[in-house]
Regions:
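N-terminal cap/lid segment of alpha/beta-hydrolase-fold proteins
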Residues: 1-31
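Glycine-rich, phosphate-binding/catalytic loops in enzymes
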Residues: 34, 50-53, 78-80, 125, ...
Length: 153
């Protein structure tokens, strides 16, 4: 089952989805995973497929759009790396307070730029028990120069 939700990060309303395993029993608490999209991604692009796979493995899953992306509110012209970390932490908080989630068993997953975000988050937030990074970038400045003209900096 999928349920659309919203939560706040730094006072900005973010859009997300919760995915519930089909075999979840009333009163049961499962490990939870927050899935994070990359630089130009949105939660509805490829994360629903990943959420379904994790649901089949028994996890509660949450996807969301960062501030200024997809259905979330916020400035559309700004990329603020640390602000994305704060968004992931807010998503973890929201997921962790769901009655179906064991807040002692939270994981984060990110692809591309989302990989860099979850690695940083895991290094600075003790709630993270598991981190998966896929297709991460290695050098942020070099990468940014490859996708933006100098006059766009």
């Amino acid at each position: 089952m999928k349920k659309n939700i919203s939560f706040y990060s730094e006072g900005v309303k973010l859009d997300g989805d919760l995915y519930y395993p089909d075999d979840l029993k009333k009163g049961e608490r499962r490990a939870g995973v927050v899935l994070c999209h990359g630089y130009t991604g949105v939660k509805d692009l490829y994360l629903p497929d990943n959420a379904r796979v994790l649901n089949e493995a028994g996890y509660m899953v949450m996807t969301f759009d960062y501030k200024g992306w997809g259905e979330s509110e916020g400035a559309r012209t700004r990329l603020a790396p640390y602000s994305r970390v704060v968004d992931v932490q807010a998503a973890m908080t929201f997921l962790g307070i769901q009655p179906e989630v064991n807040d002692e068993r939270l994981g984060i997953y990110g692809t591309s730029y989302g990989c860099a975000t979850v690695v940083w988050t895991a290094a600075h937030d003790e709630r993270v028990k598991c981190t998966v990074g896929v297709v991460g970038m290695g050098h942020g400045g070099r990468w940014m120069r490859s996708v933006r003209r100098p006059d766009e900096w």
